[in-house]
């Protein structure tokens, strides 16, 4: 078996996690108490969904995941929520006082006390696997726990499980919508560690997903539940081929191989189509070509970033439902002829496709319509550089005046860490510029030292 362990850190990580496990359970027909009437092999078996769920002798299915937060309220919602019987109590770990939006608290003072407990639980989950293929890590980098404890845990996972893949689903601060003043500090400090310790990071931001909810689903005032259910669809599409048997299956490590041209350039855009409300879906059924085009629309991106400002390096299309390879090839061929969608000249093929025959599932009473086919795209574009430039600019404005820095230093950080992280991101911006540079020959000389 190729098992995957999910790690949900901080409020954002946990709430996205809730939405994901809710959706997985619906997709596999697992009840909130972990029973699965359709499952004939009791106690394990080689069903594809065992990559994400382990089975007890009593036929209960337990998610292979942990929820981790420095304060109890969010984890308590899981402990008392609909799916409280699904999780083993040891999988839900919470501390007493939160990180207070402070990276240093999450990474040094408070995070340090809880991280060993978390690693201990992860070790138990890992021992329960026959062939662990990697970790999915869910966090946001604007707050204190997701950024500080998140990066601390990733660093420790690199030490303990060096060769295993780590995929991050990371919520970045949005350009306009802000939840904390010190977001730029936390995200820069955290990205510094993500650069080294994740293999692929899929970037998300709330503002982009708010806009999608407003525009495509006609939700006037989207809540986090609306956003998280949308994110869950994306993550479900990515992991569908690990959980179901399909025609063109995609392994976690395959994402890495196909999407990451250079180790540092591993931050991905994601999009999902079709996003339509139930009222509209009643009147239209979308073809493979239409949903493929929709996935490339700048407005479909789950992070505020316009791919037209850069070039694609690689792109992974995961189809599910009623889709055959012939349609996919035709759609991809059409995309390649479009002038607006440009690839770098050193990557001529650029597409990796996966097909899974399990049609998309929707949460009953949710916003999304039940459709016959859907596609999720993860792409590596040079335009992602603009997200980092935006963050760095905000960081610089504050750091020039050393505003708020004393809070971090007071928790045991050194000022040198700020400048080190900032220099690392400056180098990253430069990497993006070089990769997008016009010709492959010109870039060749400069890149010799770098990689």
From Swiss-Prot:
Positions where N6-acetyllysine occurs in the chain: 40
An annotated GO BP: microtubule-based process
Reactions this protein catalyses: GTP + H2O = GDP + phosphate + H(+)
Principal location listed in the UniProt entry: cytoplasm
Necessary cofactors: Mg(2+)
Site positions per UniProt: Involved in polymerization: 451
Stored PROSITE patterns: TUBULIN (PS00227)
Keywords assigned: Acetylation, Cytoplasm, Cytoskeleton, GTP-binding, Hydrolase, Magnesium, Metal-binding, Microtubule, Nucleotide-binding
Molecular-function GO terms, alphabetical: GTP binding; hydrolase activity; metal ion binding; structural constituent of cytoskeleton
Positions with a binding annotation for GTP: 11, 71, 144-145, 179, 206, 228
Family membership: Belongs to the tubulin family.
Protein name: Tubulin alpha-1 chain
Gene label: TUBA1
